[in-house]
Amino acid sequence: QKAAIINSSEIYRKCAIAHADGTFSNIRVAASKAADEMLEISGVNASFVLYELGGQVNISARSLGRYNVQVIMESMGGGGHHEMAACQLNTDMDDAKKQLISAIDEYIRNN
């Protein structure tokens, strides 16, 4: 499952963005591990994995320190730490990804 998540990733402004299709028992753990591993992709400063759980879209965010994912996730109603953060959105996967891309754009514009 983790490999499938990583394989779905695309790079946007030095961020790896991936999504988990469907739901499975350990989706939260798989998403977190995938976000960690995606930081190993050359040129990536942050990673984000979107997955559905409990009727919401969750985003697990990781950073190597160059991008403050806490600030990005806080702008979307979440929180966390400089290198590890998350948020939950009451929307669908497509809209969540659009919101994430807007939040990344805003972060880069302001930092």
Regions found by a protein language model. Name each.
Residues 1-75, 80-111:
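Hydrophobic helix-and-loop "lid/oligomerization" segment in the mid-to-C-terminal part
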